[in-house]
Structures are given as structure tokens and as C-alpha cells.
Amino acid sequence: MFKFDKEQMVIEIAGRKFGGQPGEYPTGLSGTIFYARHKIVEDEIKGIFDKSAAEALINKQAEMEDTTGNPALVQVFGGNPEALTKYIDFVAEVWDGPMLLDSTSGEARMAAATRATEAGYANQCIYNSINVSIDEAEFQNLVESDIEASIVLCFDPMDPSVEGKLNVLLDGGKTTDTGMLDLAEKAGIKYPLIDVACTPLGSGAGQSVRASFAVKAKLGLPVGSGIHNIPSAWDWLRDFRKGLREAGQTQLAKDVHHVCDIGANIVQTMGSGDFVLYGPIDNAELAFPAVAMTDMVIAETAKDMGTVPVDTHPINKLL
């Protein structure tokens, strides 16, 4: 294990802390709710869903947070403004921790930022995300909101290398004229979480993990990713699972995906990750123990270098 020479930022969002030296703070774990084809969603256009089931999922993740000490975040996904604003209003009622405002629609993200500001729970919110494709309207909407935390994506489509990821944060890289960190500061973001933008195996997955070390070593900022997307985009695994299903081994096909899906989060955690977007919140009882165990291994080795884990670290709760 190692210790960074660079002083490491620790940020606090809705009572949860992220960052620091490896082995100091437990890894934050963010589960996604209301994602595409989530069985609890009854109408994804109007944002109608099973409230009891949604609350149960959020509460289960909260229980895992209490058990392991790993900070929990709720990644709230909605495909349009109406749905996303309904979803975040509900989550704010039943959860007092951090939540990510997430959508493939810029209009939905803008509506969510505005709603969170008007309703008074912007301090819980993490914008997802500031990246090279953000336009002026979305940027200005973020400026006018009360949101102070955001995922900052270090992805340059023109340069997927580790150097390219650092450059896009600092000066815009090969795609834009403004660095993402400068853009975040101008938008009023005080608490940046750097997403190293994991790409598929064979297309830069390894560089993404290495970028975690580079960002912390050079900038000292909290880093993480949605690394579970790596097995989801792995063609070989998809074909392997198909073969298992055709052979009547349906359960094994599911298990293989779960192992790779949860295992990917361990890779990011060992790669000096401070947070992981682990995928469906339904998997909380799989993700939390796996990452807590990884955090404990890191903390044990880091103690020899003088790093002291916080009281809520899994190593102080699960032994």
C-alpha cells in the first residue's frame, strides 16, 4: 500500500465524508434507483413508482451504511424533468444523506437542480455531472442553483490517456478551452468528486484506474467511478453468459455477472478510489460487504505508514 505526498482533500456532503489518504476514510458507495427498466417504476415518463418498495431499497442501503461504516449515496436517475423532480422530492423525504441528480437529459438535470434549490435540499445534492459536453444553458442553471457538490468527469473523447484525463481537468485538453475544475469553480462547486470515466476493457479501462492514482497524486481530490459498467460492456462475458443460459445454467449465468459486477468495485477501491457508483441499489447487500472488506485490507496495510482510520471505518466496526 502507499501514502500520497500530496495533501488529500476531505469533503463533507450531507454529513458524509469522502477523500483522504488510502485507509483513512471508508469508500462511499452510491446505488442507483429508478434506473431504466427498474421494476419499482410503473411509469418512467410521469415518474410513477412503488413508494413502499423504493423506501425499502433506500432503507436497506442505509442499514448497510450503519453496519459497515461505508458512507451511502443514492444516485437518482430520471429520464425527463417531470420524473426526475418527483423522484428527488421523494428521496429527500426519506433519506437525509447525499443524492446524485442523474439523467441523460440536460433539461432533466436542470429541472432537478432548480427543484432542489427551491425545496431547500440542495445541500444533499451532487450534480452529475460537469463534463466537456455541458452547454451554456445548463452551466448557467447550475450557477443560479444552490448546489455546491458535483461529479466532475475527467473524460476527453479526443484523448483517453491518463495525461488526457488530467489535462481535461486542468485546461480542457483537446476538446474544450476551459478545464473542468475551473468550470466547476465558476459554477459555484465547492465539493468536486472526480469521476475517472471508466471505459470498456480494451478501450482504456486500465488507464481509467491508473488515472485515479494520478488525480490523487497530482491534485489531491476525491476520486471514483462507475466501474461496474466495465463488465456490462464486456462482449466475451455477455457471450459466455449466453452459453450458460442455453445450457440450462440460468442461475450460474446470473452469478457470473454478479461476481464481475461487484468485483469491479473492488478494483476501483484498491485503485485509491474514494467513492464508487456501484450500480443498482438492489445490490447494496452485495456491494457493501465486498468494499468494506477491501477497505479493511487497505487500512491494515496503511497503518504501517502512519495512516489512522476514522472511528467509523469498517476496520473499527467489523472486527
Swiss-Prot record:
Pfam families: MtrH (PF02007). Pathway: One-carbon metabolism; methanogenesis from CO(2); methyl-coenzyme M from 5,10-methylene-5,6,7,8-tetrahydromethanopterin: step 2/2. Keywords: Methanogenesis, Methyltransferase, One-carbon metabolism, Transferase, Translocase. Its EC number is 7.2.1.4. The keyword ATP-binding does not apply. GO terms for molecular function: tetrahydromethanopterin S-methyltransferase activity. Signal peptide: none annotated. Gene3D superfamilies: Dihydropteroate synthase-like. It catalyses: 5-methyl-5,6,7,8-tetrahydromethanopterin + coenzyme M + 2 Na(+)(in) = 5,6,7,8-tetrahydromethanopterin + methyl-coenzyme M + 2 Na(+)(out). One of its GO terms (biological process) is methylation. SUPFAM superfamilies: Dihydropteroate synthetase-like. The complex is composed of 8 subunits; MtrA, MtrB, MtrC, MtrD, MtrE, MtrF, MtrG and MtrH. NCBIfam families: mtrH. Belongs to the MtrH family. This is Tetrahydromethanopterin S-methyltransferase subunit H.
